[in-house]
Each structure stands twice: as structure tokens, then as C-alpha cells.
């Protein structure tokens, strides 16, 4: 069970309460039942993006462990507009927009999770016909002081910007979804922490067991600064074509490479760690970005599309000839020395060191056309030096 917990805890930003997952898992075993895992979306835009996929991947982790997955489509609350992170009123959507976006969301969920064994609920089920007396009863469970703890409301209030009453009740309505489905755990981005904690408070107010709140880090957008968002036009959509998806990943700043590696790819943790180590040793960030871009395109399209997108990027964007494209560039400290094994490991971080040793000892590694079979030999870092590893991999030390 420890390995399963490690997987479920991987990459999370905040869990409230801190040991809540372990307690919920123990309770589920005691009661011989699955946990109910909730993830909610307001269909405010037609496309999901890689930022949404960070949370969807965590949902898949729980799905893989056999738990009950409930996705809430906030078709009712989308008509209000989530004020999270807003410094002004979010415009509500029309019923037509909401219905259209809801369907595209459901289709796109299948790119990350298995939609055959999840429950999809719309919160209009319980809100459309809720008597007004029940609305009053619901909002009486939360105080204005609690609501005003939200940073976005507090900022707007202090700057005398308007805060509308329908925005104030939004977190309460979203939280009530957890009451209706008896959620054990709610997932979301860190920007949803307040809303999700309201759900926990409401469950307890209705004499139910409070849900655990797990939030995931927010993936930076293409600018490398603000969170990925369609409204900021800094996003990579799950439905982007392969060439656009690849090119957008290649455009990210070097400062967010590791976040994209850990949050947006489905590489094994061991491979991710190896790449991070090699990046620290001086592997060209361009090489890392290509690995990330390839993985992401393969994940949301297929392997052939990823290969074609790579070729398109090198031919059209980098304007490299086929011969130049054969040699990836390694950036290492000029004039320094590095062992042959470390050099090969920097060049090919995804290949294990034991496999690289085998290649070296078998005579499959050449440095400037000279066969090298001593893994501990120190190689001087000289710009322009060519390295061949096997028949497939060719590298050039950059200046």
C-alpha cells in the first residue's frame, strides 16, 4: 500500500488536513468501500488545456487505484461565473455556450482518464429546482467573515471595487456539490483551495464527514509567469494540433522546464529525476524541451504525430538541414573535463548508466571518430567535438 500512497501523494501542493488521505484510505478499508473522488469544472471555455490536465492526472491516479470518480460539470454555477483570481466581475455565459462547452469538456476528459467508469454529474440537477427556502438555509451555513477571507474578495473590497452578492455565494454553491455527492476527497488547483474548503465546511454543517482537500500546483503558461489560462492566451490546448502543441512547448522559458517535465508529461519518475540531474550537469535545455514536447504530443496525439511534429519544428522553425538535425547540441562548460560515462549520460539521460556502460565497453561510442571504450576516461570539453553513441545518436558540443 505504501507505493500506492506515494503515487497518490506525488506532485501535490497542499493537502488539508495534512494526513487526511491516509485517514480516508484507512476508513475506506474499514468500511470496505471505495473513496468518492470529486473534481469539478465550470464549462467557461470550449477547451481544456495542460493546466487542467495536471489535476486530471491526479484524478487518474485515484482512478487507477479503483476509487469512485465523480466529475461535476458546473453548468449551473457557470451561469454565475467563478470569481477566483479575478479583480473584476466575470461575465456569465449563456445556456447555449454552457451546453456546448460541457459536451466538449466531456470529450476531452477522455484524453487523460477513462471516461467509461466515471460518473459525470451536472450541478443543475440539484440547483435548478431548489426551493428558495433551501437556498437561505444553505447560505446560512457560511458567514460573511469567512467569505471575505478570500484574497480576491478582500483585494476588491479594500480597493472599493464592486463585489456582487452572486459572486459571494459562488463558493457556497460549489461547496454544496460536495454535500450532494458525499465526496471523500476533492481535487483542484491551488487557486481552488478556499472553494474546496468551503465544501468541507458545508459537509460538516450538514452532519456529514468532511472531505479531504488536495490541490495541485498551477502550471505556468507560455509566458512562464502567470498560470496557464485561456483568457490570458498563454495556454496549450488539449485539442491543439500536433505541430502547434509541439511548437508551443518549445517556446516556454527555460525557468519552467522542470515544472513542465514533472506536471505535464507522463514520464516515469525515475526518468524525470535523471533528466533533472542531467539538466543540472549542463544538458542543453533545447534537448530537454524537445523530449518534453515529444512526450506531450505523443500523449495527446500519437507517436507518429510526435515524430512528424519534431521534424516540422526542426525544418520550419529551426531551419535545420537533415544533416544538421542529426546532431543534437550539448552545452557544457568550455575547457572542463567530463568522464566518458558522464558525457554519455548527459547526452542520453533517459538511458540507464548500466546500459551506457555496456555501449561504451562494446565499442559503440566514438569521440571525433575515435572509438572510446574506457568509461572513466576524461574527455576535454571542446566546442565542435562530435560524439556518436551507437548508430542512432549523434551529438556536437556547442560553443
Curated annotation (Swiss-Prot):
Keyword Ligase included in the entry's annotation: yes
Chain ranges of the S4 RNA-binding domain: 338-398
One GO CC term, this protein: cytosol
Keyword hit for Aminoacyl-tRNA synthetase: yes
Record-listed E.C. numbers: 6.1.1.1
Reaction catalysis annotation: tRNA(Tyr) + L-tyrosine + ATP = L-tyrosyl-tRNA(Tyr) + AMP + diphosphate + H(+)
GO terms, biological process: tyrosyl-tRNA aminoacylation
Short motif ('KMSKS' region): ranges: 227-231
CDD domains: S4, TyrRS_core
A GO term, aspect molecular function: RNA binding
Binding site for ATP: 230
InterPro entries listed in its UniProt record: aa-tRNA-synth_I_CS, aa-tRNA-synth_Ic, Rossmann-like_a/b/a_fold, S4_RNA-bd, S4_RNA-bd_sf, Tyr-tRNA-ligase, Tyr-tRNA-ligase_bac-type, Tyr-tRNA-ligase_bac_2
Signal peptide: none
Keyword annotations of the record: Aminoacyl-tRNA synthetase, ATP-binding, Cytoplasm, Ligase, Nucleotide-binding, Protein biosynthesis, RNA-binding
Motif ('HIGH' region): 43-52
Compartments, as annotated in UniProt: Cytoplasm
Subunit note: Homodimer.
Cross-referenced NCBIfam families: tyrS
Protein role: Catalyzes the attachment of tyrosine to tRNA(Tyr) in a two-step reaction: tyrosine is first activated by ATP to form Tyr-AMP and then transferred to the acceptor end of tRNA(Tyr).
Family: Belongs to the class-I aminoacyl-tRNA synthetase family. TyrS type 2 subfamily.
Protein name as it appears in the record: Tyrosine--tRNA ligase 2
The organism of origin for this protein: Photorhabdus laumondii subsp. laumondii (strain DSM 15139 / CIP 105565 / TT01) (Photorhabdus luminescens subsp. laumondii)
Protein encoded by which gene: tyrS2
Amino acid at each position: 500500500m505504501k507505493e500506492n500512497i506515494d503515487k497518490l501523494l506525488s506532485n501535490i501542493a497542499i493537502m488539508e488536513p495534512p494526513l487526511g488521505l491516509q485517514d480516508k484510505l484507512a476508513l475506506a478499508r474499514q468500511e470496505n468501500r471505495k473513496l468518492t473522488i470529486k473534481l469539478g469544472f465550470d464549462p467557461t471555455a470550449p477547451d481544456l488545456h495542460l493546466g487542467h490536465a495536471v489535476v486530471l492526472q491526479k484524478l487518474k491516479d485515484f482512478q487507477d487505484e479503483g476509487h469512485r470518480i465523480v466529475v461535476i460539470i458546473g453548468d449551473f454555477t457557470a451561469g454565475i461565473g467563478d470569481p477566483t483570481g479575478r479583480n473584476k466581475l466575470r461575465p456569465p455565459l449563456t445556456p447555449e455556450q454552457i451546453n456546448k462547452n460541457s459536451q466538449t469538456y466531456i470529450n476531452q476528459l477522455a484524453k487523460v482518464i477513462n471516461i467509461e467508469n466515471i460518473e459525470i454529474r451536472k450541478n443543475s440537477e440539484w440547483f435548478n429546482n431548489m426551493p428558495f427556502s433551501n437556498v437561505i438555509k444553505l447560505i446560512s451555513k457560511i458567514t460573511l467573515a469567512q467569505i471575505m477571507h478570500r484574497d480576491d474578495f478582500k483585494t476588491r473590497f479594500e480597493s472599493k471595487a464592486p463585489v456582487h452578492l452572486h459572486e459571494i455565494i459562488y463558493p457556497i454553491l460549489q461547496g454544496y456539490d460536495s454535500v450532494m455527492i458525499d465526496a471523500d476527497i476533492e481535487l483542484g488547483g491551488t487557486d481552488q483551495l478556499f472553494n474546496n474548503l468551503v465544501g468541507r465546511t458545508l459537509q460538516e454543517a450538514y452532519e456529514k464527514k468532511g472531505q479531504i482537500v488536495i490541490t495541485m500546483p498551477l502550471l505556468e503558461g507560455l509566458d512562464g509567469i502567470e498560470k496557464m489560462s485561456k483568457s490570458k492566451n498563454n495556454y496549450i490546448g488539449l485539442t491543439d494540433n500536433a505541430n502547434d502543441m509541439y511548437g508551443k512547448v518549445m517556446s516556454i522559458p527555460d525557468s519552467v522546464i522542470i515544472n513542465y517535465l514533472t506536471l505535464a508529461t507522463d514520464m516515469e519518475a525515475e526518468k524525470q529525476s535523471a533528466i533533472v540531474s542531467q539538466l543540472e550537469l549542463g544538458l542543453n535545455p533545447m534537448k530537454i524541451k524537445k523530449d518534453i514536447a515529444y512526450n506531450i504530443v505523443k500523449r495527446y496525439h500519437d507517436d507518429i504525430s510526435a515524430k512528424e511534429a519534431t521534424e516540422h519544428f526542426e525544418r520550419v522553425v529551426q531551419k535545420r538541414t537533415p544533416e544538421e538535425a542529426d546532431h543534437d547540441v550539448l552545452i557544457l562548460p568550455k575547457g572542463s573535463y567530463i568522464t566518458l560515462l558522464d558525457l554519455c549520460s548527459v547526452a542520453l539521460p533517459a538511458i540507464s548508466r548500466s546500459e551506457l556502460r555496456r555501449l561504451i565497453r562494446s565499442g559503440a561510442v566514438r569521440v571525433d571518430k575515435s572509438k572510446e571504450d574506457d568509461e572513466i576516461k576524461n574527455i576535454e570539453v571542446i566546442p565542435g567535438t562530435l560524439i556518436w553513441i551507437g548508430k542512432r545518436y549523434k551529438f556536437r558540443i556547442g560553443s
